[in-house]
């Protein structure tokens, strides 16, 4: 497997046709390239230490289901294009037998198993908008065993009747932001890339309503813990399809003079 130096070379190597589920079928050469990529991904992941677990071997865990289709791939039924930069980095990590940095930002307290299914001869016909973990047999990625803070129910913003929707401009690029709250709850919200980090903070405050938390800051764990400048736009802060973590700010009484 040749080494990938940049995104352009990744696009050349991943010759699978990408796009929405109703895109045109692949020609013979494109299909062969797609099959080669999917097969090599399994091979490289195996060399890096990925293994298939039987149901009796598995422990309590959070699993992620990845399906590789003709026209793209899905992560727990969330459709993604092969040509997208974030998707390329995600799959390149899988190919190396590593847990993608995106998942490190989501799961930091629980073991994660990844199931990769080969569906390169099929076209993905339906998608779901929200990434959610699943339970099932999977390929464990070597040493990647992050933990999740608490078992939290996935909640979409549409389920909050008191939540004010974020105003979107459909003429501008839109991205989904996964938000992990300090209480363990998680939600997904769409923003324009021109929105600022402060808009995410405003959204969280409205989302929490009367149960508003103490003062907090926003951070991302990709590729390392980084606190965010609230004045930056999502595009400037490189937060497209990112995971944002609510970090409570500790408050303490001033030292008393003796």
Swiss-Prot record:
UniProt KW Methyltransferase keyword: no
All copies of domain UBX, residue ranges: 170-247
Tissue occurrence: Expressed in the prefrontal cortex (at protein level). Expressed in the habenula and hippocampus (at protein level). Expressed in peripheral ganglia.
Keyword set, alphabetical order: Cell projection, Cytoplasm, Endoplasmic reticulum, Golgi apparatus, Nucleus, Ubl conjugation
Taxonomic placement: Eukaryota, Metazoa, Chordata, Craniata, Vertebrata
GO cellular component: cis-Golgi network; cytosol; dendrite; endoplasmic reticulum; Golgi apparatus; nucleus; perikaryon
Annotated protein name in UniProt: UBX domain-containing protein 2A
Compositional bias (Basic and acidic residues): 1-14
Region described as Required for inhibition of CHRNA3 ubiquitination and translocation of CHRNA3 to the plasma membrane resulting in an increase in acetylcholine-gated nicotinic acetylcholine receptor currents: 1-165
Region (Disordered): 1-30
Quaternary assembly: Part of a complex composed of STUB1/CHIP, VCP/p97, CHRNA3, and UBXN2A that modulates the ubiquitination and endoplasmic reticulum-associated degradation (ERAD) of CHRNA3. Within the complex UBXN2A acts as a scaffold protein required for the interaction of CHRNA3 with VCP/p97, this interaction also inhibits CHRNA3 ubiquitination by STUB1/CHIP and subsequently ERAD. Interacts (via SEP domain) with CHRNA3 and interacts (via UBX domain) with VCP/P97; these interactions are required for the interaction of CHRNA3 with the STUB1-VCP-UBXN2A complex.
Summary of the function given for this chain in its UniProt record: Acts to repress the ubiquitination and subsequent endoplasmic reticulum-associated degradation of CHRNA3 by the STUB1-VCP-UBXN2A complex in cortical neurons. Also acts to promote the translocation of CHRNA3 to the plasma membrane and subsequently increases plasma membrane acetylcholine-gated ion-channel activation. Plays a role in the inhibition of STUB1-mediated TP53 degradation, via its interaction with HSPA9 which acts to inhibit TP53 binding to HSPA9. Positively mediates the ubiquitination and proteosomal degradation of RICTOR, may thereby act as a negative regulator of the mTORC2 pathway.
Region (Required for interaction with VCP): 168-258
Pfam family, one: SEP
Gene3D superfamilies in the record: Phosphatidylinositol 3-kinase Catalytic Subunit, Chain A, domain 1 (3.10.20.90), SEP domain (3.30.420.210)
């Amino acid at each position: 497997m040749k080494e990938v130096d940049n995104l352009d070379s990744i696009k050349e190597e991943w010759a699978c046709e990408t796009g929405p589920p109703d895109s045109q079928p692949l020609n013979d050469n494109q299909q062969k390239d797609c099959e080669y990529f999917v097969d090599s991904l399994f091979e490289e992941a195996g060399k890096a230490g990925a293994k298939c677990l039987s149901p009796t071997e598995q422990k309590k865990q959070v699993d992620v289901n990845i399906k590789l289709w003709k026209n793209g791939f899905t992560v727990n039924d969330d459709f993604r294009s092969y040509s997208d930069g974030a998707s390329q980095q995600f799959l390149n990590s899988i190919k190396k037998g590593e847990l993608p940095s995106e998942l490190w930002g989501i799961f930091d307290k629980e073991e994660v198993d990844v199931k990769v299914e080969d569906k390169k001869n099929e076209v993905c016909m339906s998608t779901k908008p929200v990434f959610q973990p699943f339970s099932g047999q999977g390929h464990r990625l070597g040493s990647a065993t992050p933990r999740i803070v608490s078992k939290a129910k996935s909640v979409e913003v549409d389920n909050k009747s008191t939540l004010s929707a974020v105003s979107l401009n459909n003429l501008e690029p839109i991205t989904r932001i996964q938000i992990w709250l300090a209480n363990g709850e998680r939600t997904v919200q769409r923003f324009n890339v021109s929105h600022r980090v402060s808009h995410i903070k405003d959204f969280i405050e409205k989302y929490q309503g009367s149960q508003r938390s103490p003062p907090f800051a926003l951070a991302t764990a990709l590729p390392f813990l980084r606190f965010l400048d609230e004045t930056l736009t999502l595009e400037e802060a490189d937060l497209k399809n990112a995971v944002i973590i609510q970090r409570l700010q500790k408050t303490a009484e001033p030292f008393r003079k003796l």
